[in-house]
């Protein structure tokens, strides 16, 4: 929005400066100073014109805020007024439009719903319509006519939409027209009026919801107001109420700033204690309106301060002078509506919008910049605005008074941070470039002769530098403590501890922002980092102190627990700057081009490590000492990466040469390895020599006269092989001579018992006999002695007989009784030494031989063959005696071995199994 700045003279128009696009309902810059005579005459003629307008024409004209009525109003010609003053007719129209709010309440229930008529030719709002004096009178007449139509001639308490809209359009046209001359209007209409339509459309629904609670009181309604009625006119009345607030505030702003008398009093305290949006725009417009005024930038207070704001609104009305009780109540109503409008205000865009102030201050506008609180309390040069003015665009009396604490600061944009421009002879503008996610706040350059130092980008985590020149016109500042609530606390923020004087900062509200760190004056495009709630300072106090020259580049890894140097005492303290070697040091401006001459130094991985050893290489004389926590590369400060994240080691540039520490470690390692290798080799040689000497002492193979040089030490891989493997110089051990008398070596026995000499002789003799017999009888050795060879049928061995007898002994004597032919139980004779046949069958069946084989064995052993028939007649049930049972078991074993059963058991077998079978009789 390009608006010419007026100094109160119609002919003196300064060059148009690009100012900030303003969102919300209050749009244009304020009117300049005007005489009190116009204002008094306006208040007198307002009552008559408005009372006459209430009984005028009956047609109701509804201006729909969503249509181009407001835009048509502001897009009109260059305007008929040039900022010198407002005519009595327009002041009467403004006052009449404000008084017309009380004409529409009583007859609202009776009023017929009239649909809104869009502005399509009914009312011309251009240069021939509501522009100039005739437009203002027409707006007042329409407001009176609508009030008369709704109320039936009675005095109502509800505001009317038409009166409010006409008043708002007249005021918008009047204010824009009063500050525009010539061709400087071309860029005006779209930006402001579009937001007016947008804001009016958005705030209508919210005010309609609030009217039922009774919180929203119409102005000039007295003590009997009741907002409980709901009807079809609620929408129109809410929009009218909003426009009326705008008109009332502008009528108060249009009062002359030099007049010490009483003003109109409509919304007397609204400009200062009203909604945050109107207060912000008021302070912003006042800073543009007067070159000597300084922009009061403060943050939005929390909602808990609403009560204090309302009380200050009442006090501001009383100090306004001519308001009175009715005006105080109207201000409260206007304040509530304005605050609700500001809550529905669309957020500012994320794209930075350059703002060119007259003083050359350029500041990026973003939605994530914390508020910077700049309070003006001048001791040598007073504020341009007198204390009796009704607009109160600067700081309120409560804040300026030294006795009272500043409870309510001037409210500025919640999503932007502004620095107050100071008047300078040379209006040099220093464009600064906003950073990625943390918008920066540029300091003001107030030097008339030398410009600001060109700044270069800083590394990712190095805070932005503060480049301040001592001001030539900076007045004595009295720091004021404010209760500031930051809207955004993103990212680290610099603590301006490099300045000799530090102002008392606001109390920390948000605990999510990282601790502030010291600023780095390494040249950067970021003049000042966004200030966190723990590190906010007044730019005025900073501008007084000269710039302290930095010393060395800062460390990339600044410790997070670096103590913040902001003072939390009750009074502002002047604190000496910290020594730069303790924390992030700063590079001097003279050394900005010198890091290229310095040898690159590899940064340590952790800043908390010890100071690296001194480098033996000569360093330039201008290089300052490096502190403990700032040992870093000099060229690391030139990379501009993200502002709020630590840079990992992988993203840093690779060092061109290894650091001195690495070289020292490598040299030490190489020396230690060489020395240790020599020590190990000599030690190994000594050990091997000792072991060889001890081993050769017992070996007589080497002659004592000859001395040989020690063998070379074995390789490292085979250093232990000499222990297990024989060397060529060693002689083998002689064999042991432990054998027979003949000297023939004898094989060692394993598990066998050593044989006696008799057995050895028998074996030798048998061998000789076998060899001789072989030679004698070469073929068929058993051909002529058939009966002399051993056979298996000859007899039972001793071992087998003992085993079989054991089985007999365990089974004899069973079943000693039997039944005779008469059926009597008869004891069997000899049953004690015999085994019954049933038991024999059971035992023999365990051999799993066939029944025919078992029958054959039974037949061979029972009664010894020939006695079986006789015994069978004598013995009942058949029993086997000891020798019969033993021979039967022996036959079964032979059959199991694969031998055939004989047709007859020989006498030798019976003799070996009898009672005398085991006894050998020698002759």
UniProtKB/Swiss-Prot annotation:
Sequence intervals crossing the membrane: none
Keyword Phosphoprotein: no
SMART domains for the chain: EH
UniProt keyword Magnesium present: no
Protein name: Increased rDNA silencing protein 4
Name of the gene: irs4
Family label: Belongs to the IRS4 family.
Composition bias type Basic residues, residue spans: 770-782
Composition-biased stretches (Gly residues): 262-272
Ranges annotated as biased composition (Low complexity): 41-58, 519-534, 643-659, 692-709
């Amino acid at each position: 929005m390009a608006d010419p700045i007026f100094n109160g003279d119609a002919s003196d128009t300064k060059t148009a400066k690009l100012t900030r696009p303003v969102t919300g309902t209050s749009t244009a810059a304020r009117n300049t100073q005007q005489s009190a005579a116009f204002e008094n005459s306006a208040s007198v003629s307002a009552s008559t014109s408005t009372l006459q307008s209430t009984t005028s024409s009956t047609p109701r004209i509804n201006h729909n805020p969503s249509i181009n009525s407001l835009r048509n109003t502001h897009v009109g010609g260059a305007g008929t007024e040039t900022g010198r003053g407002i005519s009595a007719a327009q002041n009467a129209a403004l006052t009449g439009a404000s008084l017309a709010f009380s004409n529409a309440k009583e007859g609202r229930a009776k009023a017929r719903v009239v649909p809104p008529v869009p502005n399509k030719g009914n009312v011309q709002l251009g240069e021939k319509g509501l522009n100039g004096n005739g437009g203002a009178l027409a707006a007042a007449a329409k407001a009176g006519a609508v009030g008369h139509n709704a109320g039936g001639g009675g005095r109502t308490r509800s505001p009317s939409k038409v009166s409010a809209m006409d008043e708002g359009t007249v005021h918008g046209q009047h204010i824009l027209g009063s500050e525009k001359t010539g061709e400087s209007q071309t860029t005006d209409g779209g930006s402001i009026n579009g937001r007016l339509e947008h804001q009016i459309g958005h705030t209508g629904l919210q005010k309609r919801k609030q009217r039922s609670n009774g919180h929203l009181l119409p102005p000039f309604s007295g003590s009997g107001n009741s907002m409980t009625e709901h009807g079809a006119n609620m929408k129109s009345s809410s929009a009218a109420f909003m426009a009326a607030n705008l008109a009332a505030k502008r009528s108060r702003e249009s009062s002359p700033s030099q007049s010490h008398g009483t003003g109109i009093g409509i919304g007397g305290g609204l400009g200062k204690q009203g909604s945050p949006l109107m207060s912000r725009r008021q302070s912003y417009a006042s800073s543009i309106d007067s070159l000597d005024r300084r922009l009061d930038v403060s943050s939005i207070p929390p909602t808990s301060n609403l009560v204090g704001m309302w009380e200050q609104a009442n006090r501001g009305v009383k100090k306004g002078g001519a308001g009175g009780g009715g005006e105080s109540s109207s201000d409260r109503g206007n304040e509530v509506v304005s605050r609700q409008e500001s809550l529905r205000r669309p957020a500012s865009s994320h794209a930075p919008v350059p703002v060119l102030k007259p003083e050359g201050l350029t500041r990026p506008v973003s939605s994530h910049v914390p508020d910077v609180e700049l309070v003006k309390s001048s001791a040598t040069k007073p504020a341009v605005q007198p204390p009796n003015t009704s607009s109160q665009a600067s700081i309120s009396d409560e804040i300026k008074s030294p006795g009272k604490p500043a409870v309510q600061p001037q409210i500025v944009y919640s999503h932007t941070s502004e620095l107050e421009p100071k008047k300078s002879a040379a209006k040099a503008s220093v464009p600064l470039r906003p950073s990625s996610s943390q918008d920066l706040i540029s300091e003001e350059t107030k030097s008339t002769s030398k410009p600001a130092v060109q700044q270069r980008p800083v590394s990712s985590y190095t805070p932005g530098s503060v480049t301040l020149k001592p001001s030539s016109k900076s007045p004595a500042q009295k720091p004021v403590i404010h209760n500031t609530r930051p809207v955004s606390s993103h990212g680290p923020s610099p603590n301006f501890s490099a300045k000799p004087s530090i102002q008392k900062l606001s109390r920390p509200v948000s605990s999510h922002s990282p601790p502030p760190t010291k600023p780095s004056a390494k040249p950067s495009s970021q003049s000042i980092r966004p200030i966190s709630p723990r590190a906010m300072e007044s730019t005025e106090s900073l501008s007084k102190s000269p710039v302290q020259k930095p010393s060395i580049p800062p460390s990339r890894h600044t410790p997070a627990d670096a103590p913040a140097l902001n003072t939390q005492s009750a009074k502002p303290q002047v604190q000496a700057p910290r020594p730069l070697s303790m924390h992030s040091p700063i590079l001097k401006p003279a050394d900005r081009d010198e890091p290229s001459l310095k040898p690159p130094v590899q940064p340590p991985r952790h800043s908390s490590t010890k100071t690296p050893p001194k480098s033996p290489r000569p360093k330039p004389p201008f290089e300052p000492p490096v502190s403990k926590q700032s040992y870093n590369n000099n060229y690391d400060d030139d990379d501009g990466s993200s502002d709020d994240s630590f840079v990992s080691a992988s993203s840093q540039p690779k060092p061109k040469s290894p650091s001195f520490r690495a070289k020292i470690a490598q040299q030490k390692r190489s020396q230690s390895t060489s020395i240790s290798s020599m020590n190990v080799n000599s030690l190994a040689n000594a050990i091997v020599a000792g072991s060889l000497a001890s081993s050769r002492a017992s070996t007589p193979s080497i002659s004592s006269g000859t001395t040989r040089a020690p063998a070379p030490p074995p390789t490292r891989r085979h250093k232990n092989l000499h222990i297990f493997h024989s060397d060529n110089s060693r002689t083998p051990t002689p064999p042991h001579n432990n054998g027979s008398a003949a000297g023939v070596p004898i094989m060692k026995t394993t598990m066998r018992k050593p044989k006696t000499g008799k057995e050895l002789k028998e074996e030798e003799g048998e061998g000789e006999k076998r060899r001789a017999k072989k030679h004698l009888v070469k073929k068929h050795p058993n051909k002529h002695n058939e009966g002399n060879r051993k056979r298996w049928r000859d007899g039972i061995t001793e071992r087998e007989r003992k085993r079989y007898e054991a089985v007999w002994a365990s089974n004899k004597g069973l079943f000693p009784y039997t039944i005779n032919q008469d059926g009597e139980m008869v004891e069997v004779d000899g049953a004690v030494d015999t085994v019954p046949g049933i038991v024999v069958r059971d035992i023999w069946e365990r051999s799993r031989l066939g029944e025919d084989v078992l029958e054959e064995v039974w037949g061979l052993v029972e009664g010894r063959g020939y006695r079986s028939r006789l015994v069978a007649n004598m013995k009942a049930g058949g029993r086997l005696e000891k020798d019969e049972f033993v021979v039967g078991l022996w036959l079964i074993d032979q059959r199991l071995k694969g031998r055939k059963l004989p047709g007859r058991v020989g006498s030798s077998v019976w003799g070996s199994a009898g009672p005398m079978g085991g006894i050998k009789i020698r002759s």
